[in-house]
Structures are given as structure tokens and as C-alpha cells.
Amino acid sequence: MHALRNFAGNGIANVFGCGIRRRLSYVLGIETSCDDTGIAIVDTTGRVIANVLESQQEFHTRYGGIIPPRAQDLHRARIESAYQRCMEAAQLKPDQLTAIAVTTRPGLPLSLLVGVRFARHLARRLQKPLLPVHHMEAHALQARMEHPEQIGYPFLCLLASGGHCQLVVANGPGRLTLLGQTLDDAPGEAFDKIGRRLRLHILPEYRLWNGGRAIEHAAQLASDPLAYEFPLPLAQQRNCNFSFAGIKNNSFRAIRARERAERTPPDGVISNYGDFCAGLLRSVSRHLMHRTQRAIEYCLLPHRQLFGDTPPTLVMSGGVANNDAIYANIEHLAAQYGCRSFRPSKRYCSDNGVMIAWHGVEQLLQDKEASTRYDYDSIDIQGSAGFAESHEEAVAAAAIKCKWIQPLV
């Protein structure tokens, strides 16, 4: 049942055994949790057979944020053609699919409904098992598809995206333990709101970019990257929770003060926006590093030993893992503890169908009998969803005092 638990160094193919190495299985993944329509096919060796992604970013950027009913309409308009294109690219017949995996939780309910209804229809028509997928679990496990020899269970994962910020220990699909989570905003959400308030979208090069990408690029233009410094959130709380509302509000105040000093017009951007973005990135990096550092130390406690017998491993995933400056700092932090660090390829950090298909593969690997479900109508959506276990209280009770590792820049 737990063939993958001690799998580091063995490779995916070895876990399956000779019989399955001769006959590949294909899992179709469907992702519609927010504003991306993703459909992909992954085989049981982790090879991506086809990957189709329809982004709604350009539409929602024009309106300053995601509009759930319009996101649902766009998913409905695109999902059938995305599926057809995926099957054509894979050069497979529908009956060659082994199973269909679909995001059921968490996410925007209106968006989730489109994917789940389409998946039910497809599974029923093809008489294939339907595998429900936890969206954040899929982010956490994605790097294993690309690094099967290096990432074994258990491992620590920092999940940072537009809707979430969590620290979890992964032991397998459906077997994640929460160590800490954001108490308010997620980092990607904060980047988007700060980017809009800074009015980076006025600049032609950032017109169609999300806030995080624009801020990362603008930070590279800084002449004085230490010009802005923001208070560290939750500095007195010895747990692994996050808070980005303070950084966001302090950013708004700093922008407003600079605009007043420069008399920036309503359609203008402060002159030292590069310095501001560099300071913002450093502050977010410090906060992520501090909470992750405590999580590493908690995992290494003699009476916990949450890494088990595997080499200590830290994975960062989610849309914010695309940010090279932030990931470099997380990588730097991990190295101080002799901890290996990984992230998915950039094309797989943000939402996509590949990670959903791969989670389906992981479910089948862990327990094929339990994962093979034909009770289609009982598989439904959940707008919010937690994990199997939580150590949040235990982390706080441990009250670990850390000697902080400083960011690279």
C-alpha cells in the first residue's frame, strides 16, 4: 500500500514492478479551481504526454481581479475544446485512459463545478474511475514527478500562491500534516494588490502581467534595494503561521507617502518603484524564511524526526515559487540545515492540469483499490479544505527560538 513511502533513490518505474513497466497507464487531469482551465495527460512514469492550459489572466487583469461568474463562463466555453486538443496532442483514444483526476477542493466553487461536472460526464461515458484531487496537495507533490529519484516521503513543503500560504509535511496523497498557514492574505494576493496600488500596470511592459511577476521584474531595476524596509510580521509568535496583511498595508502607506512627496499624478508611478519592489521582495522573503526555518527545526526535533529516514528535503511550490528571488532565499535557508531544496519547473508552479494528473498517478500508486472510484455523483466540490492532520498547536507549544538566517540580498 505504501510502496512509495521509502522510495527515494528507486525511481517511479521500480515501484510499479516489471508488469506495469511493460504496460503504461495514462491519467487525465482536469484543473479549474480558479482562473486557469488546465487539462493534461501523464503516464505512470511521470512523463507528460499532453498539456493544454487556457489562461484567463488577460481578461481578469483588465478588471483588477478575478470575477467568479465570468471565470465560470470562460471555463465552460473552453473546457471541451481543451479536452479535445489534449487528446489530439496525446494521440490517444479516450478508452486508453486509465483514470480521470479532477480538482474538487479547495477553490472558487463556481469554477470547481465546471471541472467536476465535465469530469463526471467524461468518466461516466468512458466508464473510467474518477479520482478527486486536493488542489494544494497536487501543488505539494508536483516536484516529485520531475525529481523522482531525489524526493521521497516524507518531505517538508512550503506552499505559496495567490490564495494560500502553508507549511506542510507530505507523507503521500491524502496524508499531509499542516504546520502553519496564513492568518489573512496570501503572498500572491498581496503582490497583486500592491502591484495594482503601485500602478505598475500603467507601464507598458507590465500591462498584462500579474502583480508578482511585475514586482519581481521591477525589483531588478533598483538602485538602492535597501531603501524600503517593512516590519517583520508575527515576530513575537513562535509558530509557523504567516501574515501578509501588515506588509500589504505598510506598502500602501509607503506608496502614498512617496506619491505625496513627489506629487505623483493619478495616472503615474513613483519614481523609485524599483527600490520599493526590491524592499517588498526582501520583506516577503524574510517572512517566508523565518516561518520555514522554524518548520525545519520542528521537523528535526529529536522527539519528532518528521523527516524519518529520508534525507531532509524542502520543496517550494505554488505560483509564488516562480519568483527566482524568493526561491533563491528559500534555497539558501535550506542549505544552512543541510536540507535539499526543490521546486517544480516554472510551467508547473502555477495552476495546471499536469499536477492534477500526477496526483492521480500518486493516488493509484499508493492504493489503487481504494482510489478506484465509480461513485461519480458522490464526488463533489468543497470551496475550502484542510489536510489530514495538523501540528499547528504542537509547533506553538514547542516555542522554538531560532537564530535567524538572513536573506541573500
Curated annotation (Swiss-Prot):
Substrate binds at L159, A160, S161, G162, G163, D192, G212, E216, N322, N323, S350. Keywords: Acyltransferase, Metal-binding, Mitochondrion, Transferase, Transit peptide, tRNA processing. Its cofactor is a divalent metal cation. A divalent metal cation binds at H135, H139, D351. GO terms for molecular function: metal ion binding; N(6)-L-threonylcarbamoyladenine synthase activity. Its EC number is 2.3.1.234. GO terms for cellular component: mitochondrial matrix; mitochondrion. Coiled coil: none annotated. It catalyses: L-threonylcarbamoyladenylate + adenosine(37) in tRNA = N(6)-L-threonylcarbamoyladenosine(37) in tRNA + AMP + H(+). Binds 1 divalent metal cation per subunit. GO terms for biological process: mitochondrial tRNA threonylcarbamoyladenosine modification. Pfam families: TsaD. HAMAP family: TsaD (MF_01445). PANTHER family: TRNA N6-ADENOSINE THREONYLCARBAMOYLTRANSFERASE, TRNA N6-ADENOSINE THREONYLCARBAMOYLTRANSFERASE, MITOCHONDRIAL. This is Probable tRNA N6-adenosine threonylcarbamoyltransferase, mitochondrial. It comes from Drosophila melanogaster.
